[in-house]
Amino acid sequence: MPCVQLPAKESALFKRVLKCYEQKQYKNGLKFCKMILSNPKFAEHGETLAMKGLILNCLGKREEAYEFVRKGLRSDVRSHVCWHVYGLLQRSDKKYDEAIKCYRNALKLDKDNLQILRDLSLLQIQMRDLEGYRETRYQLLQLRPTQRASWIGYAIAYHLLKDYDTALKLLEEFRQTQQVPPNKIAYEYSELLLYQNQVMREANLFQESLEHIETYEKLICDKLLVEEIKGEMLLKLGRLKEASEVFRNLIDWNAENWCYYEGLEKALQLRSLDERLQLYEEVSKQHPRAVSPRRLPLSFAPGKKFRELMDKFLRPNFSKGCPPLFTTLKSLYCDTEKVSIIQELVTNYEASLKMNGYFSPYENGEKEPPTTLIWVQYFLAQHYDKLGQYFLALEYINAVIASTPTLIELFYMKAKIYKHMGNLKEAAQWMDEAQSLDTADRFINSKCAKYMLRANMIKEAEEMCSRFTREGTSAMENLNEMQCMWFETECISAYQRLGRYGDALKKCHEVERHFLEITDDQFDFHTYCMRKMTLRAYVGLLRLEDALRRHTFYFKAARSAIEIYLKLHDNPLTNDSKQQDIDSENLSAKEMKKMLSKQRRAQKKAKVEEERKHTERERQQKNQKKKREEEEEVTSGHKEELIPEKLERVDNPLEEAIKFLTPLKTLAAESIDTHLLAFEIYFRKGKFLLMLQSVKRAFAIESNNPWLHECLIKFSKSVSNHSNLPDIVSKVLAQEMKKIFVNKDLHSFNEDFLRHNATSLQHLLAGAKMMYFLDKSRQEKAIATATRLDETIKNKNVKTLIKVSEALLDGSFGNCSSQYEEYRKTCHSLLPLTPAFLPAAREALGLSAELNHTADHKLLMNEI
């Protein structure tokens, strides 16, 4: 329909509608819309209908909003306002591609509309359509050449496209238009100069960057950054003498920054050990209170010199009582010689302090305070824990606790030792003891909650966190609102271990939503950062958002989700009794009765908990409704409720798994787990070329990985079992597999793997599994290989030993209950306090293995 022109009265009302929308006076806006539309002549006025829809959307009436906007668009399809409003509606629903189409249609009708161009540019940078963003910013620059944002936005577009020369020309041209009072530092001008310099450095214009920073040094606020840039550029240009002076000045400013020492060493071109030691000795004399010049030489000093420096480093720290001392030195523990020297020094301190109160029996003068011995023994507990000598570590920590039962760090350390031993329940109890000494300490509270979750004590962990969450709401919901992802990822693992897959998936999807929210949250910064001239931070934000799902929290949640979906694909949950069938398969009548009684109690408890949650939900909904009424505004696009029962009964688990996998393949491609998880999905889908792609990528990262070895053999076996593959696919598979298997049959390939990794328990386990997989008659040989625990075997830690135990119970070696019992006894003799190897642990471990046996067999172990 043709555009209907409003007369003066209605036109004035329409302007008031626009004003009410801008000022968020939505009820008044609707009232004015009604006044226009109530006139029969203008009942179909497109722009008014569209604005009414936009206002309704702001009030949370999404369906009505779309109805009115579409009606308005049908009434006046040639109106740029209608298309613009439709775009705003799509944008509010996060349908950015559709919104861009609407804006482009609007611009066809009004190509110079500033507001539409601005909105379009925001969506283009949000979607990283950099070419389109550059064109739109160019149009804005032509229309508003006097506005700062026009120049800055256009320059940033070229910077992001890596056209540094054009970006620098634009920035310089804009800088010359800025009038800055002489001898006065303006923050925004300072940020512009620093951004300009950043572009120069990224363009490898080191000489220009140095000249630029020296020219405008007095106009820049961040003096420290100026010096850091100078030092970096002088190093790049080979002007080493000047660079060394800059880095010496930086060390005078901050003697604890390790990067400055690295820069100084490069500038001085120190080659010999003596020169390096002399440098740190000089700096240490100039800055006697600084730790870094005394700590850094410990990383490269050898033998006798290391002993001397370590002795000087340890004594003052023990005397004054420095809890993080061991953390400072932990990186040295990859060198066995240095570990031996540390152990000898500290044990000698302990013996001498006990005997005469000095660090050495040959000293005299003022004795060390009694607390020195406490810190020495605390250090020894950490030292032996790091070496895996848990009983010795417990001896020391118990001795210190007996003498000083009020020191939080001691209980914290004791909990840590039990965690490393695999006794997670005991670890949680001792961490609870630690937090009881200072209930106002948020760090120790969080640690306690984390340990409880590791011990599958989910309710207790929630109660622990509730001390620091908002009153009136459940801790779990409040932590979700606060995007507390460390808690949620730990919950995921706990639910997964307990076989509560629906709850685990709910948390996985909540973490996924957090990352979506973080991505959406950048929208407001596209205009804010240009207005405030925080350009370096803005570019940093854009780059962070591009790689957001590389974050460890997302990786953990995605990996767990994929593992659960694989499990659900292999063993679909058809009804509520399915899990009971799995649990009760091998139970006697007495055990069955006990289990049913336990289930009844659990159901009763769950019912009470559900009623509590229902009441809490109702109260929350009332509060939210009240809040909506007060604000007269509700965010549109309600999120779908995550119901655990629905999540664990999806129609196609593998497709759901792929949704979590896709970001990992792009952003976490350097992790072998990404490609092996991809293999497990494609293996179940029968996608041979994608399976090949996954194992090839994994092989390029770590060819000797135990999990990869299992995947390769399963892949090869699957290919040989499918003789009906297309010729071209078979040819490609044969050609590529030849490069990996080097013309060996699977048995020979597996034997070679076992021979080359004869001292690694993880590799022996993988090889033994594949031995049984390829030939069921070799069960005894396979079990003997996996359960080897002689002196030559490395990594005999709790993590790996439990892995072997689970493999003996989950069917990887068939039925082998007698061999499991024998292996359990052997492990129990090695680690008597680890619950997994106690005589009564078989049933629990067996259930755990059944519930948690996933594609990578690593879940429980990662928590220890």
UniProtKB/Swiss-Prot annotation:
Annotated Basic residues bias: 595-605
PROSITE patterns with a match to the protein in the record: TPR (PS50005), TPR_REGION (PS50293)
Alphabetical list of SUPFAM superfamilies matching this protein: TPR-like
UniProt keyword terms in alphabetical order: Repeat, TPR repeat
GO MF terms, alphabetically ordered: ribosome binding
Keyword Repeat on entry: yes
Residue ranges with Basic and acidic residues bias: 606-621, 635-646
UniProt-listed GO biological process terms: negative regulation of apoptotic process; protein stabilization
Stated role: Auxillary subunit of the N-terminal acetyltransferase A (NatA) complex which displays alpha (N-terminal) acetyltransferase activity.
Subunit structure: Component of the N-terminal acetyltransferase A (NatA) complex composed of NAA10 and NAA16.
Name of the molecule in the record: N-alpha-acetyltransferase 16, NatA auxiliary subunit
Organism whose genome encodes this protein: Mus musculus (Mouse)
